[in-house]
């Protein structure tokens, strides 16, 4: 995977966790969308794309270049990368050098939603498959 090679070249330790996406996706939703009712989640199609919480303005976040800048500045020791269509999760350690431009969402000529979240789930960066949506950055202690 091109993403893994790029990260390793930056000195980031990458471990591929098999079949962990659904578990991490659930944790992401429980952390960042816990204030939404089931009905609200249904209305914004959260089950389809977690990033709808941002595009439907359900929580305030940084967008576009401000999101990239915030992601580049946030402390990154350990974090996860997970994708919309891939069951595996990448665990990154020693990720201090990870930057927004290092996130690849073009996988085999198919644009993917890419979610990056720190291992404590205190912030998230989302690079969507839609050119006109995102990227988004949200940190829990921002509010």
Write out the residue ranges for each language-model feature.
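Structured alpha/beta or helical-core interaction and ligand-binding surfaces enriched in interleaved
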Residues: 1-133, 137-143
